[in-house]
Amino acid sequence: MGKTSGAKQATVVVAAMALGWLAIEIAFKPFLDKFRSSIDKSDPTKDPDDFDTAATATTSKEGL
């Protein structure tokens, strides 16, 4: 066997990576769909730190 060119090796590597990515997408499709839909439903303007601080303050006032 002779030496393979760098371009041919790169093509094989890229094709293998694409095939691997496709296999992962197919194998985990239900989980990825659920994850992506939950991201779409999330509110980017909501700050969880503000919510936690308000809930903690309310809880501490009720305890007194």
From Swiss-Prot:
Membrane association type: Single-pass membrane protein
Cytoplasmic topological segments: 33-64
Keyword NAD attached: no
Impact reported for residue 33 to G: Impaired targeting to the chloroplast outer membrane leading to plasma membrane localization
Impact when changing residue 15 to P: Reduced efficiency of chloroplast-targeting
Biased composition (Basic and acidic residues): 39-48
Source taxon at top rank: Eukaryota
Spans through the membrane: 12-32
Disulfide bonds: none
Keywords: Chloroplast, Membrane, Plastid, Plastid outer membrane, Transmembrane, Transmembrane helix
Any GO CC annotation of this UniProt entry: chloroplast outer membrane
Region (Disordered): 39-64
Effect of residue 19 to P: Impaired chloroplast-targeting
Consequence recorded when altering residue 23 to P: Reduced efficiency of chloroplast-targeting
Compartment(s): Plastid, Chloroplast outer membrane
Bias (Low complexity) ranges: 53-64
Tagged with keyword Manganese: no
Domain notes: The transmembrane plays critical roles in migration to the chloroplasts and/or subsequent insertion into the membrane.
Designated name of the protein: Outer envelope membrane protein 7
Taxon lineage: Eukaryota, Viridiplantae, Streptophyta, Embryophyta, Tracheophyta
